[in-house]
Amino acid sequence: MSVMLQSLNNIRTLRAMAREFSIDVLEEMLEKFRVVTKERREEEEQQQRELAERQEKISTWLELMKADGINPEELLGNSSAAAPRAGKKRQPRPAKYKFTDVNGETKTWTGQGRTPKPIAQALAEGKSLDDFLI
């Protein structure tokens, strides 16, 4: 809670602050507080009415669906017939580059992920990636 709200919520602090203002100013502040409080109450009541209307509409639709033999779960796609299938496993990418590692073994690289050290070293020495194309 902010310092201002703590001050407004403490009766002793309010009394001390009220000594600095005239009665007319205090009456004006009181009227403003009443207006703000009334507006806030009306907002809360409006939200409650809207929520009640929404709940009533939902219950009406549920009753209509049950009368027609429709299960609400079917609409959400939770039925076994509408269950999404697991995605197919992706085919591995074909190798795009061929290089020889430090052990003299010939290896391939798809071009994705981290660049192999032998290729990175060759690129640093000025070679082109096209030199390693299969």
From Swiss-Prot:
As for subcellular location, the record says: Cytoplasm, Nucleoid
Coiled-coil stretches: none
User: Mind telling me which SMART domains this protein's record contains?
Assistant: HNS
Specify the inducers.
Expressed at low levels at 37 degrees Celsius, barely detectable at 26 degrees Celsius; expression is repressed by hns and partially activated by lrp.
* Chief location of this protein within or outside the cell: cytoplasm
This molecule's function is given as:
A DNA-binding protein that acts in a fashion similar to H-NS protein upon overexpression, represses a number of genes including the cryptic blg operon, hns, papB and the proU locus. A subset of H-NS/StpA-regulated genes also require Hha for repression; Hha and Cnu (YdgT) increases the number of genes DNA bound by H-NS/StpA and may also modulate the oligomerization of the H-NS/StpA-complex. Repression can be inhibited by dominant-negative mutants of StpA or H-NS.
PANTHER family associated with the record: DNA-BINDING PROTEIN STPA, PTHR38097
* Designated name of the protein: DNA-binding protein StpA
Organism encoding this protein: Escherichia coli (strain K12)
